[in-house]
Amino acid sequence: MRRIAIVHDWLTGMRGGERCLEVFCELFPEADLFTLLHRRKTISEVIERMRIRTSFIQHLPLAACFYRYYLPLFPLAVERFDFRGYDLILSSSHCVAKGAVRAPGTLHISYTYTPMRYAWDLYGAYFGDWTGPIASCIIPTLMGRLQRWDLRDRKSVV
């Protein structure tokens, strides 16, 4: 039997990406579902029935409510998932799930909804308008790193 891993950015509500994820879960109910963060009872029963594996982000202080502020850690979190022994990785991504690192011989198919827009042009829309000398130094540096990662991580997908 083929082992399948589904990777989704986070599970905190039912929006468009989660509706697609729900279909993937119906197609592959035996798959393991990897995600950065899972807030129970915020997603459909179809998704809740999956074997859900979360990242270290799940255990960070206040992550359930303020997970977006951990954005600079998201690439590290998704890259730390261990996919050895899986034949297929199916990532459902609008952020970092597409950056799942495949093991040799593993096929990675990514359904990418959009680029990581908050790293490119919509940071203020997602996080508010941070101003001040510290934010004006740190934010562009962090966003530059995320942009480079966003471009580089495409190489994991075959």
List the model feature ranges, each with a label:
Residues 27-98:
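Active-site donor-binding segments of glycosyltransferases and PAPS-dependent sulfotransferases
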Residues 128, 132-158:
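Membrane-proximal helix-turn-helix segments that form the acceptor-binding/catalytic region
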Residues 13, 41-43, 97-101, 117-120:
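Short catalytic/ligand-binding loop motif for oxyanion handling, primarily in non-cytosolic enzymes
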Residues 1-12, 36-37:
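Nucleotide-activated donor-dependent transferases that construct or modify glycoconjugates
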Residues 17-27:
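Short amphipathic alpha-helix
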Residues 88-91, 102-132:
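Active-site proximal beta-strand in glycosyltransferases
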Residues 28, 85-87, 105-106, 154-158:
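Short, well-ordered alpha-helix to beta-strand connector turns
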Residues 4, 30-31, 108:
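Hydrophobic anchor at the start of a short beta-strand
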